Curated annotation (Swiss-Prot):
The lineage of its organism: Bacteria, Pseudomonadati, Pseudomonadota, Gammaproteobacteria, Pseudomonadales. InterPro entries: Acetaldehyde_dehydrogenase (IPR003361), Acetylaldehyde_DH_C (IPR015426), NAD(P)-bd_dom_sf (IPR036291), Semialdehyde_DH_NAD-bd (IPR000534). Belongs to the acetaldehyde dehydrogenase family. It catalyses: acetaldehyde + NAD(+) + CoA = acetyl-CoA + NADH + H(+). One of its GO terms (molecular function) is acetaldehyde dehydrogenase (acetylating) activity. The keyword NAD applies. The active site is at C132. Its EC number is 1.2.1.10. It is an enzyme of class 1 (oxidoreductase). One of its GO terms (biological process) is catabolic process. NAD(+) binds at S12, G13, N14, I15, S163, A164, G165, P166, G167, T168, R169, A170, N171, N287. This is Acetaldehyde dehydrogenase 1.
């Protein structure tokens, strides 16, 4: 008998399909059992069927009717924020113990960025993977936070237009709200702000992220070392994650922060690039790769903590 925990993915679009391929190829503690969509003609459902995975085009209702549903322990939701709230409520009526890994900005469970706070949420029945921008940048804010108090952090996530499917586009407001909040809750900033840019350039550009952190004055070498150490930790599950250039520091004086008064201290600027593993979409779609990689790392660690199947 397999000792792997069975999983289902809701959402057969870009993120769901990439995640499915990662689970099939790389998962040590998880087994891909079902792919759920609402469009019978979607490439994701067709690909899942070709790979021997049970499929349904009838949404979560169809999932509960699949014979394999009774054996499923984890459900990844790669739909949209509004849909996730309904999906979670519906599935819990059928199986209350399901572990939901939420890849939308719904955030009905605690935020989870694996390198920063996964160990605190191993027992949670619903965790939220924040956003692609959050997964890339919050570790950098947290890296500064563990050295100096962070008063303000602002991130700019630039992604290729081609990598943004309808779900991403429908959730732009939720992206900025959820990422901003998570910068504060997980990153440790007193105030967080997030901006997303969809770049229509051809050929498509790789995901780029810029992180600006205003903190109390501290040892710059210590902050740089903390950032480099954190980047290496992220690379353990997102190999294409890297610092694009050296961390930059600037002493600032009497800078006005809206709602916070004036600030004097250290400005740290971090420049990141995220290259995708190209499991389903091209390498420029690092924004999708970091989400699916973080979700997989989270569920793998949870499954490991649950111990062997009875």
């Amino acid at each position: 008998m397999s000792q792997k925990r069975k999983v289902a993915i809701i959402g057969s679009g870009n993120i769901g399909t990439d995640l499915m391929i990662k689970i099939l190829r790389n998962a040590k503690h998880l087994e891909m059992a079902a792919m759920v969509g609402i469009d019978q003609a979607s490439d994701g459902l067709a690909r899942a069927a070709r790979m021997g995975v049970a499929t349904t085009a009838d949404g979560v209702d169809g999932l509960t009717r699949l014979p394999v549903f009774q054996d499923i322990d984890f459900v990844f939701d790669a739909t949209s924020a509004g849909a996730h709230v309904k999906n979670d409520a519906f599935l819990r009526q059928h199986k209350a113990s399901l572990r939901m890994i939420d890849l939308t900005p719904a955030a009905i469970g605690p935020y989870c960025v694996p390198v920063v706070n996964l160990e605190q949420h191993l027992q949670a029945i619903n965790v939220n993977m924040v956003t692609c921008g959050g997964q890339a940048t919050i570790p950098m804010v947290a890296a500064v936070s563990r050295v100096a108090k962070v008063h303000y952090a602002e991130i700019v996530a630039s992604i290729a237009s081609k990598s943004a499917g309808p779900g991403t586009r429908a959730n732009i407001d939720e992206f900025t709200e959820t990422t901003s909040k998570a910068i504060e809750v997980i990153g440790g900033a007193t105030k967080g702000k997030a901006i997303i840019i969809m770049n229509p350039a051809e050929p498509p550009l790789m995901m780029r992220d810029t992180v600006y952190v205003l903190s109390e004055t501290a040892d710059q070498k210590q902050i740089a070392a903390s950032i480099e150490e954190m980047a290496a930790s992220v690379q353990a599950y997102v190999p294409g994650y890297r610092l694009k250039q050296q961390v930059q520091f600037e002493q600032v004086h009497n800078l006005t922060l809206p709602g916070q008064g004036t600030f004097t201290g250290l400005k740290t600027s971090v420049f990141l690039e995220v290259e995708g593993a190209a499991h389903y979409l091209p390498a420029y779609a690092g924004n999708l790769d970091i989400m699916t990689s973080a979700a997989l790392a989270t569920a793998e660690r949870m499954a490991q903590a649950m111990g062997p199947l009875a």
